[in-house]
Amino acid sequence: MVTPVRIAPTAAARARSLLRAVQYSHGPACPCHSSPSHHHQHVGSAINHAKRSLATPVDSFRQKEYAFEMAASSVRFGPGCTKEVGMDMKNLGAKKVIVVTDPNVVKLDAMKQVVEGLSKEGVEFVVFDKTRVEPKDYSIKEAIDFARPQNADAFLAVGGGSVIDTAKLMNLYTSFPDADFLDFVNAPLGRGLPITKPLKPLVAVPTTAGTGSETTGTAIFDLVSKKAKTGIAHRALKPTLGICDPINTRTMPSAVHASSGLDVLCHALESWTAIPYYERIPRPSNPIQRPAYQGANPISDIFSLQALRSTVQYLPRAVRDPDDFEAQSQMLLAATLAGVGFGNAGVHLCHGMSYPISSQNPGYHHHGYAVGGTPIIPHGVSVAVSAPSVFRFTGASNPERHLAAAEIFGVDVSRVKKSAAGEVLGEALAKFLVGLGDQPRGLKALGFGKEHVDELVEGTIPQARVLMLAPSLSAEVSEEREQLRGLFRDALEY
């Protein structure tokens, strides 16, 4: 990989960064950064930068990060490994388990394997099967209300990201029974309080290949009153174990393969192109305050790039051929790899913009999703629809990384100028999305128009947790609004 050049921040950029940190600070869970125009650089340069920072007395609030941490769930991967879950729960000392699933997965073989495994080991369990696809705050609260009187000592999630995220929050709020729902929700929509004690064991059995939620400390849902998608991010939410059994993804419809895979794609691309960890401020005064989303780092890079390679190679096959077990298996592995990558490096604009896209849905119902006739923009679709626009915009922040990504899509970049890196990657992404078939070619296809742009921008602004990792995005809010308006307009069609 070509070593990028670091551009030193100007005094104005540092001032803008400080202003943004003050405006959007939300405690220890909030990753933030300095000049968004910084380029990635190799580890040696980062070490020298840290030495200079440590040697120079400065305001601690403005000190940049000098370290990164890697955290992920334990993962077991292999066809048929679901049958071991009963032994896992027994090994964890669980006496009573809440099994969390949804109305569709409860009928599938994955749940049959779970029930048989728990019963065989004599582990008491109760099933909650009312999880909503793309959870709302009220559906999360219903799940928490179900869990509280059960006095369970472990949770077992069987399903896609919606199920796993719901189980994480059931675990959290039963462990903190006196907490208000907004206490742990990411600021500024919630209070962003830290999680101050370990939670109960949670084992996750994913049945989709997309969110990577089995490896991360993030749970996402719609905050209906604010017309915003938000969530809670903390290492304490991470599942104790992720059981990744490729057999469980064989029942996914083609549309779900596509949408889930697009989430993997953007997890990989966004974490690969996020600001580097050593440009994030403020440096935590205590390591326990280091956020889950820290910026790109040499270890997350490995996971993110491999996830991108696998997704480009195997997602089209998994979508086109329901009997391509190799492609399905590789996509489940890619989702897990990307989960480790973005679970530590973070995501940025595609995800930040996706939250208002899905929560402000003007009435679009994605083909292949059976949710009782309710309008739905699947998460992966809402993320990917802006991707060509986003990476055209971020290309100048680090041309080398954008060209490296374009090369994975099969682009010959040997004669491409660095100034064209964003355009080249954006074009490669658009071509890939069209090739998958049945994907909306921009926001217009979802029912959005120019008249919706301002509301979409206002729904994106509060997503400070991810926007602060976005390269090229201004730290000054009025300028940021204009940049986001341009991004949404550009994303209307591709």
Task: Map each language-model feature to its residues.
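A glycine/threonine-rich phosphate-anchoring loop and its flanking beta-alpha core
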Residues: 176-292, 397, 404
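ATP/NTP phosphate-donor binding region
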Residues: 31-154, 443
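Generic secondary-structure signature for well-ordered alpha-helical cores
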Residues: 90, 119-123, 133, 148-149, ...
